[in-house]
């Protein structure tokens, strides 16, 4: 994976910090089960149009979704869930 960790002006700084923490969890994970900790990640397999994705919570509104294969996350996206 790999990300730059730069802040953007359009999003709240606290939200960005939480998202960056979650991205670090994803980057460090060796298995999907690793992402069940902490429980606040609320790891879930998506359905419907997003059936190929997994998601973890950033907060009630925002999710990080990603695909997982052979111990690596890819197609990582930060989405407004509502």
PLM feature segments, named:
Residues 1-23:
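Arg/Lys-rich, positively charged N-terminal/basic patches that mediate binding to nucleic acids
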Residues 30-54:
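A short, surface-exposed loop/turn module that caps and links secondary-structure elements
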Residues 1-3, 29, 69:
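Generic structural signal for bulky hydrophobic/aromatic residues embedded
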Residues 44-47, 54-82:
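Enriched for short, Lys/Arg-rich terminal
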Residues 20-21, 35, 62:
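Short, intrinsically disordered low-complexity segments
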Residues 5-8, 51, 74:
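Polar low-complexity intrinsically disordered regions enriched in Ser/Thr and small residues
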Residues 26:
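A residue-level signal for conserved active-site and pocket-lining positions in enzyme catalytic cores
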């Amino acid at each position: 994976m790999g990300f730059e960790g730069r802040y953007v002006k359009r999003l709240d700084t606290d939200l960005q910090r939480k998202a960056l923490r979650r991205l670090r969890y994803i980057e460090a994970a060796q298995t999907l089960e690793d992402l069940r900790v902490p429980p606040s990640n609320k790891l879930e397999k998506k359905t419907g149009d997003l059936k190929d994705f997994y998601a973890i919570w950033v907060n009630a509104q925002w999710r990080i979704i990603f695909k997982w294969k052979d111990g690596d996350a890819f197609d990582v996206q930060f989405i407004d869930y509502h």
